[in-house]
Regions:
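C-terminal peripheral helix-coil segments that are non-catalytic and often amphipathic
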Residues: 1-2, 97, 101, 132-141, ...
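Amphipathic alpha-helical segments used for helix-helix packing
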Residues: 100-119, 169
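Basic, helix-initiating cap at the start of DNA-binding domains
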Residues: 1-27, 32-40, 57-60
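Short hydrophobic/aromatic patch on the recognition helix
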Residues: 41-52
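Short, hydrophobic secondary-structure boundary micro-motifs
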Residues: 107-110, 148-150, 172, 201-203
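Short coil/turn segments at alpha/beta junctions that flank glycine-rich nucleotide-binding fingerprints
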Residues: 26-30, 81, 102, 145
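Hydrophobic alpha-helical connector segments
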Residues: 61, 75-101, 157-160
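Amphipathic alpha-helical packing segments from all-alpha helical-bundle domains
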Residues: 65-75, 104, 118-144, 154-158, ...
């Protein structure tokens, strides 16, 4: 007979994900145990296994849910009928808002994905690649000379992406700069230089 799920199954499952993300962000995946996750949830270890059989399953679901939601939000941001620069602003604002509001999950994604089995890690990387590709498309519209349609991603998208993802190792949304202002600063810092950039190779070294 198939077991009937309780009405609050999804809520309890999400609560476990939230508590585990906070624990992993603070102590690291490797330094945390399922017993500690259960204690953080105010539940028994056996109760936890009703939702997640292994710690790796818990880690995968934390990063999968986080990055899938982020991808959905970013697709909405860049698919609006707006000029490319405005869609770029929306992309950065959306990325910053998600990172600021899901800082634990973001840190777990950055620091602990290496502990996932290969197949699950590849699945997460594919989602990350789609997020970067959205950015590449918008940057191509802003400055096709620097981002030719048939070229590889190039340094520009990855420079910006790297800058944004590492922001949340130090940024706290409760600090002096709110997320929306931070996003505007990032957008302006990057796009004003990128839009007018014409690449000139450095002069040969005399050494």
């Amino acid at each position: 007979m198939t077991r009937v799920r309780a009405d609050d199954y999804d809520d309890k499952r999400q609560s476990i994900l939230d508590q585990a993300a906070a624990l992993f962000a603070r102590k690291g995946f490797e330094g945390s145990t399922m017993i500690e996750v259960a204690q953080a949830c105010g539940a028994s270890k056996s109760h936890l296994y009703h939702y997640f059989a292994r710690k790796e399953d818990l880690l995968f679901e934390i990063v999968r849910v986080h990055i899938t939601a982020q991808l959905d939000e970013l697709e909405t941001a860049v698919n609006q009928a707006l000029p490319a620069e405005e869609r770029f602003d929306r992309y950065v604002e959306t990325f910053v808002a998600r990172g600021a509001n899901s800082r634990n999950e973001h840190l777990v994604l950055m620091n602990d994905i290496k502990f996932l089995p290969d197949a699950q890690r590849r699945e997460v990387r594919k989602l990350e690649n789609r997020i970067v590709d959205l950015l590449v498309g918008v940057l191509h519209e802003i400055n096709p000379e620097l981002m030719p349609a048939r070229s590889p991603r190039g340094p520009y998208a990855m420079l910006l992406f790297g800058m944004i993802i590492w922001t949340f190792t130090w940024y706290e949304k409760s600090g002096a700069i709110p997320p929306r202002e931070l996003a505007a600063r990032i957008s302006q810092l990057f796009v004003y230089g990128f839009k007018g950039q014409r690449f000139a190779p450095p002069a040969p070294s005399k050494r």
